[in-house]
């Protein structure tokens, strides 16, 4: 049986960049000043509370969750977004593999600064 996740562990930013392109970029931008798309721009997400990007229309669920994004909360969210924030409009089913989440978050922490 698989061990329960113990939180974020740094992974490969290169593999994370590929995951972002194939799994996230259709709905999100991450560069500073990037536009909101189907999902909000993710620049500066770490250290910010959920539901805070100006000009993006969030569900009440995202706003009311009021999670402060860090590597661990992002990992938990990306495991199953609809379970972590019931009522979110994020259609993405999540990344079930802990290694994939770690790689993606490692990339995001660099790209979102």
Swiss-Prot record:
Induction and repression of expression: By low oxygen levels (hypoxia) at the level of transcription. Not expressed until the oxygen concentration is below 0.5 uM O(2).
InterPro entries on file: Cyt_c-like_dom, Cyt_c-like_dom_sf, Cyt_c_1A/1B
Residues at which heme c binds: 28, 90
Pfam family, one: Cytochrom_C
Presence of keyword Amino-acid biosynthesis: no
Compartmental location: Mitochondrion intermembrane space
GO terms for cellular component: mitochondrial intermembrane space; mitochondrion
Domain of life: Eukaryota
Keywords: Electron transport, Heme, Iron, Metal-binding, Mitochondrion, Respiratory chain, Transport
Cofactor note (record): Binds 1 heme c group covalently per subunit.
Keyword Cytoplasm: no
SUPFAM superfamilies per UniProt: Cytochrome c (SSF46626)
Gene Ontology process terms (BP): mitochondrial electron transport, cytochrome c to oxygen; mitochondrial electron transport, ubiquinol to cytochrome c
Gene Ontology MF terms in the entry: electron transfer activity; heme binding; metal ion binding
Binding site for heme c 1: 24, 27
Cofactor(s) it depends on: heme c
Family the entry assigns: Belongs to the cytochrome c family.
Function: Electron carrier protein. The oxidized form of the cytochrome c heme group can accept an electron from the heme group of the cytochrome c1 subunit of ubiquinol-cytochrome c oxidoreductase. Cytochrome c then transfers this electron to the dinuclear copper A center (CU(A)) of the COX2 subunit of cytochrome oxidase, the final protein carrier in the mitochondrial electron-transport chain. Isoform 2 (CYC7) is the predominant cytochrome c under anaerobic/hypoxic conditions.
Miscellaneous comment: Present with 1310 molecules/cell in log phase SD medium.
Protein name, UniProt field: Cytochrome c isoform 2
Organism: Saccharomyces cerevisiae (strain ATCC 204508 / S288c) (Baker's yeast)
């Amino acid at each position: 049986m698989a061990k329960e996740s113990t939180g974020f562990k740094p992974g490969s930013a290169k593999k994370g960049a590929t995951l972002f392109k194939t799994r996230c970029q259709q709905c999100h931008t991450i560069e500073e000043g990037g536009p909101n798309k189907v999902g909000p721009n993710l620049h500066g997400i770490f250290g910010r509370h959920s539901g805070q990007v100006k000009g993006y229309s969030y569900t009440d669920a995202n706003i009311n969750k009021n999670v402060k994004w860090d590597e661990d909360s992002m990992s938990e969210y990306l495991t199953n977004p609809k379970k972590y924030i019931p009522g979110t409009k994020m259609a993405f089913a999540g990344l079930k593999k802990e290694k994939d989440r770690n790689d993606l978050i490692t990339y995001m922490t660099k790209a979102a600064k």
